[in-house]
A protein has these predicted regions:
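Ligand-binding cleft/hinge of the Venus flytrap
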Residues: 41-48, 131-185
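Periplasmic-binding protein-like
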Residues: 113-115, 146-148, 214-252, 254-270
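Ligand-binding pocket segment of bilobal, Venus flytrap-like solute-binding proteins
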Residues: 64, 159-227
């Protein structure tokens, strides 16, 4: 009897330790991480998952690639269980780069859409109401955009020219192009350029995604892009083959109504 009790006690301790030490690691580009962090807290309200550690690791691809692949043993978090991408061109990179690490298109899905928006300085001092103002308003002289560089991967690659060139007018592209003062290789650096500092003047506008407004509501206003010009990119997620039951549950939860309600707060929808 004592032996059985001891075995049962050790089994219970093992289960308890397993629940407490369970960990899910997500990696992806910055922006959606604001909503994801909030979704993690909502997910953990379920007693079944309250003790799980969920690590949201956002940033430029090159800053987390080796950690997500498990190649860098100095990383604070383990290899990726879930990857998120912020466009299909971004997903194509993830699919190609992580196919040796258990990620395939069969275990991925598009879950939401994000509209491109214009961020302007708080109070909208240049009275910007859409792309037409960025093109034709002579008072608008300093614009920052995101764009792909040789060592970067991003959802906003060629975004500005898709929007500005939407009507097939070369003149629109030429006018807008002449006002670009910085093409950033990531949203983090673009945000810094937009907001300015003691050494760098603020810009009048930044074409970006709505979650960057929600991260800077005290410093910026958000302007919607005209319906005949607005471009959307999807938010997609992929889960590793053989992922844990907990990781699979969170992956599924990202498509739930509860998660959707949170994403909507950041202007990410369907």
């Amino acid at each position: 009897m004592n032996g059985k009790l001891l075995a049962l006690s050790l089994f219970s301790l093992s289960i308890s330790h397993s629940v407490i030490s369970a960990e899910i690691n997500l990696y992806g580009t910055g922006g959606p991480h604001h909503a994801l962090n909030e979704i993690v807290q909502k997910f953990k309200e379920n007693d079944r998952f309250k003790d799980i550690k969920i690590n949201i690791n956002p940033g430029p691809y090159t800053t987390w690639e080796s950690c997500a692949k498990g190649l860098d043993k100095s990383c604070n978090t383990g290899p990726a269980d879930i990857l998120w991408g912020t466009s299909e061109n971004y997903y194509a990179v993830l699919e190609d780069e992580f196919k040796k690490y258990g990620f395939t298109s069969k275990r991925s899905k598009s879950i939401y859409l994000r509209p491109a928006v214009i961020l302007v300085q708080k109070g909208n001092p240049k009275h910007i109401h859409g792309i037409e103002d960025l093109i034709n308003n002579p008072e608008v002289k300093r614009i920052v955009v995101n764009n792909h560089t040789l060592k970067s991967v991003m959802s906003a690659t060629a975004l500005w020219e898709d929007i500005v060139g939407r009507k097939g007018k070369l003149e629109d592209v030429e006018k807008f192009r002449s006002k670009i003062v910085y093409q950033a290789s990531g949203s983090g650096t673009a945000a810094k350029a937009f907001l300015g500092n003691q050494q760098q003047e603020k810009t009048d506008a930044w074409i970006t995604w709505p979650e960057w407004y929600h991260a800077n509501t005290e410093k910026a206003d958000m302007i919607e892009i005209e319906p005949d010009r607005v471009i959307y990119r999807d938010l997609n997620v992929s889960i590793k083959q053989g992922a844990s039951e907990e990781a699979t549950a969170f992956y599924d939860y990202l498509s739930s109504k509860e998660a959707f309600d949170i994403f909507q707060k950041y202007n990410i929808g369907k």
